[in-house]
UniProtKB/Swiss-Prot annotation:
Gene Ontology MF term list: 1-(5-phosphoribosyl)-5-[(5-phosphoribosylamino)methylideneamino]imidazole-4-carboxamide isomerase activity
CDD domains recorded: HisA
Active-site positions on this chain: D7, D129
Family in the record: Belongs to the HisA/HisF family.
GO biological process: L-histidine biosynthetic process; L-tryptophan biosynthetic process
Organism per entry: Buchnera aphidicola subsp. Acyrthosiphon pisum (strain Tuc7)
Functional pathway: Amino-acid biosynthesis; L-histidine biosynthesis; L-histidine from 5-phospho-alpha-D-ribose 1-diphosphate: step 4/9
Keyword Cytoplasm found: yes
Protein name: 1-(5-phosphoribosyl)-5-[(5-phosphoribosylamino)methylideneamino] imidazole-4-carboxamide isomerase
Gene3D superfamilies in alphabetical order: Aldolase class I (3.20.20.70)
A GO term from the CC aspect: cytoplasm
Length: 246
């Protein structure tokens, strides 16, 4: 499915280039109108990133998220600095459909396993930001991509499989926000290796052709942010393109 994405700072829709807060672009969009339009076009879930919460969990945009959930009918998954059980419970209690866990996957692996077991695999999305090197080694980066780790993508997925892991959002960080096109090879490999995981592809989608090629890799969803905001194509075109390839 197509998952439209909004990155939010102080209630505004923005895009960061390569995760850099000092390199942000503002978009003059009415978030609430957009969500209703997306719902009417058949969108089943929207991806929201709370960039204030990602930077400092004390600044989480709870009131905005509460308003979004109560005023719109399209389900949302929310990411951005979710690091504690309280963070997860607060969001799920608001009515958020899924929470997206990032850096804790590496820094707090056992706790994340407990969350998967407690909240269930449908409520949790693991966000894996990877840097693929010249030898095809897929290294995980954390903390807004500032920090490389020694963890490898495949090892992390294997670790969480026993807890029923179902949803993985995978981003090739060299592509995100660039409109350079996705890393098709990466998605084809991981979909082939982990057939029971619902992969969400993210980063670099610039054209309808990218959607066609991504669908063929085996991903279950494509997250699209900048291309929709900058009207590279319409949501109707994206949805039709996905359905046509089904």
């Amino acid at each position: 499915m197509i998952i439209p994405a909004f990155d939010l700072i102080n209630g505004r829709t923005v895009r960061l280039y390569q995760g850099d807060y000092s390199n942000q672009k503002n978009y003059n969009v009415n978030l609430f109108n957009s969500l209703e339009v997306y719902k009417s076009k058949g969108i089943e879930i929207v991806h929201l990133v709370d960039l204030d919460g990602a930077k400092n969990s004390a600044n989480r945009q709870i009131e905005l998220l509460k308003k979004i959930v109560s005023h719109t009918t399209v389900p949302v998954q929310v990411g951005g600095g979710i690091r504690t059980t309280k963070d997860i419970s607060t969001l799920l209690d608001l009515g958020v459909k899924r929470v997206v866990i990032g850096s804790s996957i590496v820094s707090n692996k056992k706790q994340v396993k407990q969350w998967l077991n407690f909240y269930g695999p449908d409520a949790i999305v693991l966000a894996l930001d990877v840097h693929v090197d010249s030898s095809n080694k897929k290294e995980i980066s954390i903390d807004g991509w500032q920090k490389k780790t020694n963890f490898i993508l495949e090892e992390i997925i294997e670790y969480f499989l026993s807890s029923g892991l179902k949803h993985v959002l995978c981003t090739d960080i060299s592509r995100d926000g660039t409109l350079l096109g996705p890393n098709f090879k990466l998605y084809k490999e991981i979909c082939s290796n982990f057939k029971n995981i619902n992969f969400q592809a993210s980063g670099g989608v610039a054209s309808l052709q990218d959607i066609i090629f991504l669908k063929k890799t085996g991903v279950k969803s494509i997250i699209i942010g900048r291309s929709l905001l900058e009207k590279k194509f319409t949501i109707e075109e994206a949805v039709k393109c996905w359905q046509r390839e089904s």
